[in-house]
Swiss-Prot record:
The keyword Transcription regulation does not apply. SUPFAM superfamilies: DLC (SSF54648). CDD domains: DLC-like_DYNLL1_DYNLL2 (cd21452). Keywords: Cell projection, Cilium, Cytoplasm, Cytoskeleton, Dynein, Flagellum, Microtubule, Motor protein. Belongs to the dynein light chain family. One of its GO terms (biological process) is motile cilium assembly. PROSITE patterns: DYNEIN_LIGHT_1. Consists of at least 3 heavy chains (alpha, beta and gamma), 2 intermediate chains and 8 light chains. This is Dynein 8 kDa light chain, flagellar outer arm. GO terms for cellular component: axoneme; ciliary plasm; dynein complex; microtubule; motile cilium. It is found in: Cytoplasm, Cytoskeleton, Flagellum axoneme.
């Protein structure tokens, strides 16, 4: 699902600037590696579980609504090109 050099557009975030940058970098890598949304989400989730301790949840897609409970300072919703990424920690 190569997004070329798509710019990240952060729509909503409750997360440190450093962690936001990490989320965008991680998502960029995932989009370069995988074509299937489920695989992209799994890659991001596993990376964040490893780097920032479990339990992270990730949703990737072009069209979805959401309403989630998350831990303070552990939420980001952003676009890379046409693809939306919701990443949050809960549990």
């Amino acid at each position: 699902m190569a997004s070329g050099s798509s710019k990240a557009v952060i729509k909503n975030a409750d997360m440190s600037e450093e962690m936001q940058a990490d989320a965008v970098d991680c998502a960029t890598q995932a989009l370069e590696k995988y074509n299937i949304e489920k695989d992209i989400a799994a890659y991001i989730k596993k990376e964040f579980d490893r780097k920032h301790n479990p339990t992270w949840h990730c949703i990737v897609g072009r069209n979805f609504g959401s309403y989630v409970t998350h831990e303070t300072k552990h939420f980001i919703y952003f676009y890379l090109g046409q693809v939306a990424i919701l990443l949050f920690k809960s549990g």
